[in-house]
Design a protein with these regions (language model features):
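Contiguous, structured surface segment used for ligand recognition
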Residues: 1-133
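Substrate-binding cleft of carbohydrate-active enzyme catalytic domains
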Residues: 131-200
Length: 200
């Protein structure tokens, strides 16, 4: 199994889990709000790697959901920590918080990239060594990046479990009243920066 970053513990189990066309993603009700975002990231990953379209719904924490992928909180775990368990019956991701759930989702997406719709049974437990893992992007040198491209950067960072994007900007930001700084550029606006922040 190929993961980046490498999880702390990977234990192969017996059997395989076959993703199916009538599969669904079941969210723990305690994940209201951001849980939809995590489920949509997973839904998009499933579609990209297998061509299948999974529905998203809510379920009861701890209940067995045969054939489903369950995303739930486990408040006994630390912040950003997760367990991903793939069995023949179901896939379950338990995170200590929303970030942990998201990192479990990204690990599952990396598994699907390698194995497609037939996943080996496995138990993966992981947590980051550092609470902040970032990327510093110099937005002022060379071509000015668009908002859509910066969102792609954020998506790629999330895939590799980086959690902080720092932008260095000078003349590529639309400073009010200082048009001479950005006159010949296509600068980022304050609204676009806020949109990127909300997206991240």
């Amino acid at each position: 199994m190929k993961f980046l970053p490498k999880p702390k513990e990977v234990k192969l189990l017996t059997g395989e889990h076959a993703l199916c066309y009538d599969g669904r993603i079941v969210l723990d009700g305690r994940l209201l709000g951001n849980g939809d975002t995590y489920a949509k990231v997973l839904q998009k990953g499933i579609k990209k790697e297998t061509g299948m379209q999974y529905d998203i719904g809510y379920g009861v924490p701890g209940r067995k959901e045969t054939g489903a992928i369950v995303l739930e909180l486990d408040e006994t775990r630390k912040s950003q920590q997760y367990v991903l368990q793939v069995t023949e019956e179901e896939i379950r991701i338990q995170g200590g918080d929303g970030a942990g759930v998201l990192y479990g989702v990204q690990t599952l997406c990396q598994m699907m990239h390698e194995y497609g719709a037939l996943l080996p049974a496995v138990r993966i437990e992981d947590e980051p060594d550092l609470p902040v893992r970032g990327y510093y992007l110099d937005e002022t040198r060379g071509r000015v990046l668009t908002l859509s491209y910066l969102k792609q950067v954020a998506d790629r960072m999330a895939y590799y479990k980086l959690n902080q994007l720092q932008l260095y900007v000078e003349h590529t930001y639309l400073f009010s009243g200082l048009s001479e700084m950005w006159r010949d550029e296509t600068p980022l606006t304050a609204e676009e920066i806020r949109e990127l922040d909300a997206y991240c």
